[in-house]
């Protein structure tokens, strides 16, 4: 489910998230203004991106329910 969301966001954002490295960078800068109660944005997103099913996946998936990148 989360992976499908990421692929969808990748298409909307012009393929910016084509691989993990280009995925982490915009996430980190986009999340600067948000309060992050768990870990750093890149590490949390990275582990969710790899499909880990742990508590951080549930927390971070809330961020995927609304746009987090700025146009």
UniProtKB/Swiss-Prot annotation:
Domain of life from the UniProt record = Eukaryota
Q: Give the Low complexity compositional bias ranges.
A: 35-65
Region (Disordered) residue ranges read 1-71
Compositional bias (Polar residues):
7-33
Q: What is this protein called?
A: Uncharacterized protein DDB_G0289969
